[in-house]
A protein has these predicted regions:
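Extracellular/periplasmic catalytic domains that process cell-envelope and extracellular macromolecules
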Residues: 4, 26-27, 60-61, 111-115, ...
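Alpha-helix-centered segments that form part of catalytic cores
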Residues: 113-131, 157-186
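Short active-site neighborhood of thiol/selenol oxidoreductases, capturing the structured segment around
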Residues: 21-53, 65-70
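A short, hydrophobic beta-strand/beta-hairpin element that forms part of a small beta-sheet core
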Residues: 11, 119-124, 140-144, 158, ...
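Intrinsically disordered, low-complexity domain-flanking/linker segments in eukaryotic proteins
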Residues: 148-149, 153-160
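Structural microenvironment flanking redox-active thiols in thiol-disulfide oxidoreductases
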Residues: 46-150, 172
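N-terminal "domain-start" segment that seeds a small globular fold
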Residues: 1-25, 162-164
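Short, P/G- and charge-enriched loop/turn segments at secondary-structure junctions
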Residues: 1, 106-108, 174-178
């Protein structure tokens, strides 16, 4: 896991779906802004993505690189590579995104009213198998609860059991999403000209 103020490691990506393949180490001294979203995330398409598109259009030639990363930490049947490819080629959306955008009149014939103009990749998704290690659970907990070690033992055991249940329910680990300790979608990753993580 990377912290704000540290060197930003390259994103772990599965497949580039739109635009030229890139990563932090290939973008020189540009500021890097990464929009992390899920295909099945209404808020991503209603609020965050239009803002990121505006930023991209305003600053794309002025030392800012913008790209998108579609991830999946839930709804694995909807947040798929296939649905991302369909979204980027046809503008068609699925699931809760389709329902919400339709309800608010933000679709034209079931398709987005805008195109995503910047490069987009799919997060690297690793199939979960077996029991989560104590070390993995501890790292996850301490990222969420920094004062975990000072808590009573019975409370700590309850938290471990909840986290174990959570990890068992996960079908995949989304490597970029987890490496940057993102809490949900939409999220952004901001890296400065020197490659230092400035905000998530």
């Amino acid at each position: 896991m990377v912290a704000i103020g540290e060197k930003a490691p390259n994103l772990k990506l599965g497949k580039w779906v739109q635009g030229m393949e890139t990563n932090f180490d290939k973008e020189g001294d540009n500021v890097k802004l990464v929009e992390v979203f899920q295909v099945n995330c209404p808020g991503c398409f209603m609020y965050s993505m239009p803002e990121i598109i505006n930023i991209y259009q305003k600053y794309k030639g002025d030392g800012l690189t913008v790209f998108g990363v579609a991830t999946a930490f839930e709804d694995y049947d909807k947040n798929t590579l296939e649905n991302l490819e369909m979204l980027l080629t046809t503008g068609e959306v699925v699931g809760d995104t389709k329902q919400a955008l339709s309800q608010y009149g933000q679709l034209d014939d079931g398709k987005l009213q805008f195109k995503i103009p910047y490069p987009v990749a799919m997060d690297s998704l690793v199939k979960e198998t077996g029991e989560p290690s104590r070390e993995k659970m501890t790292a996850f907990i301490k990222n969420q609860l920094p004062d975990f070690d000072s808590q009573p033992e019975d409370y700590k055991q309850q938290i471990f059991e909840r986290v174990k249940t959570y990890f068992k329910s996960k079908e995949y680990s989304a490597e970029t999403f987890e490496m940057y300790s993102l809490q949900g979608t939409p999220s952004t990753i901001l890296v400065d000209r020197k490659g230092i993580l400035r905000d998530v």
